[in-house]
């Protein structure tokens, strides 16, 4: 009897362990992440950067990322900017993170103090976030940055 109970307990334990070994949750689709961000942050006055901007400013060519979208202000009175990159794998995502970090540093280093001084805190407080193979950055107001982050993180819930 003891042996039967031990075998049943061992089988139950093995079954529990196997069911807990499910694969990682699938990452959200790029379009779903951009839609979530667009619903949280007013991007209506922003324009999408083209491949030449991405290459010139980030040093990234098509093929260095699976998908990307960089939105730049279309208004000359603010510096709002929001970017989302998706790498094909973890190593590509790490390279994207480095490229975005370098880009944000370039923006800081090239800032002219007399140009829109009230906007400079947005650049100083710019943030970069990563989740899985995604890299996102935001040069936005405090509220805009928080809304973008909340929308981004909500996609990975």
Residue ranges with predicted function:
Residues 16-20:
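C-terminal motif of bacterial Sec signal peptides marking the signal peptidase cleavage site
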Residues 93-130:
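Short Gly/Thr-rich strand-loop-strand
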Residues 1-9:
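Positively charged n-region of N-terminal signal peptides that target proteins for export
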Residues 79-89:
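A short acidic-to-branched-hydrophobic micro-motif
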Residues 74, 118-157:
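A short, solvent-exposed beta-edge/loop patch
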Residues 48-79, 92-96, 124-125:
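Short, compositionally biased low-complexity segments enriched in polar/charged residues
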Residues 28-47:
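Post-signal peptide N-terminal segment of mature Sec-exported envelope proteins
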Residues 22-25:
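Bacterial signal peptide processing site
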């Amino acid at each position: 009897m003891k042996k039967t109970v031990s075998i049943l307990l061992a089988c139950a334990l093995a079954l529990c362990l196997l069911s807990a070994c499910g694969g990682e949750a699938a990452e959200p689709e790029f379009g779903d992440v951009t839609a979530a961000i667009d619903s949280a942050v007013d991007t209506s006055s922003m324009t999408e950067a083209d491949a030449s901007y991405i290459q010139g400013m980030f040093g990234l060519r098509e093929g260095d990322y699976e998908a990307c979208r960089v939105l730049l202000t279309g208004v000359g009175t603010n510096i709002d900017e929001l970017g989302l990159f998706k790498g094909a794998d973890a190593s590509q995502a790490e390279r994207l993170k480095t490229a975005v970090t370098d880009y944000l540093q370039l923006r800081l280093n090239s800032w002219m103090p007399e140009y829109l001084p009230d906007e400079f805190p947005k650049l100083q407080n710019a943030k970069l976030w990563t989740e899985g193979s995604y890299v996102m950055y935001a040069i936005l107001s405090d509220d805009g940055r928080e809304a973008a982050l909340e929308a981004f993180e909500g996609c990975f819930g």
